[in-house]
Amino acid sequence: MKTNAGDIAARLGGTLHGDPATPIHGVGTLQDGQAGEIGFLADAHYRQYLPVSRLAAILVSAACPEAPMVQIIVTDVKRAWRLLADDFTPPFPPPAISPQAHIDPSATLGPGVSIGAGAVIGAGANIGDGCRIAPLAYIADGVTIGRDSHIGSGVRILEKTTIGVRANILANAVIGERGFGNNFEDGRWLPVAQLGGVRIGDDVEIGACTTIDRGAVRDTVIGNGVKLDNHIQIGHNVVIGDHTVIAGSAVIAGSVTFGKYCVVGGACVFTGHITICDGAQFTGHSSISKSIHQPGAYSSGIPAMPALQWKKFFAKLKLLAKEK
């Protein structure tokens, strides 16, 4: 894509400081950007790189006198960058169905569907208009996927799964595998059949290698607008409310219910059968073992500190425990 600073400012509704004819052909960072590229400044930490940056233009929320490049001043830098990044994203290739894909004759494919080599579409599956199924994806019998969804390479979507429109499911995610249900009988663990499914709303993103178990009886539910990072484990019967975001490596045990607009930091762990209210936020590595009824920020665990300081802290903690 080739454009100029003036056109970008007009597109974003920004105020231009500099030559509107400045050519822009790509994007870059303050540290590593090159001539002809545009970047953004949304964190004061990176302002130190402005005077020496080679970028041709920068998105900022206020004028920076030390910046040698063209500046485009916008109200919301992150929103402006999202719009600009979309403009620079290469278009998808024309829709095509690979002859190496295996598609059951009873499956339904909407107009404009693309299916890559080695992908499998099971009996009775329903793939909505404009969906893109990457190579080696597996869509089981009876699965429904809403229009304009992207299913990444190696994704496994198993029986009794329904997915809304505009889903983005990244490589090697697994949706609808059996939940971790076992019963201890006569000195051994015996598996309990998992009879539910998975229901996923509209505009959901599911990261690479994330797993979502099907329900034991009722469905596991992922609400509209939910964003899940990579390597997340979601147990059976979990309900995640609309527009909740969960960062990588979080572990959510079975039957946890989240409200809407929750924010979960990386590597958080949730005990099963608890309820999280709307608007709760958890910092990374928090361990949540009880229901949360009030919105706000919650933390647990100890942040990193110098090793010697940690040893002294832990020694004092042991002494405190002995005193009690």
Spans of model-derived segments:
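Structural signal for interior beta-strand "rungs" in well-ordered beta-sheet cores
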Residues: 40, 96-306
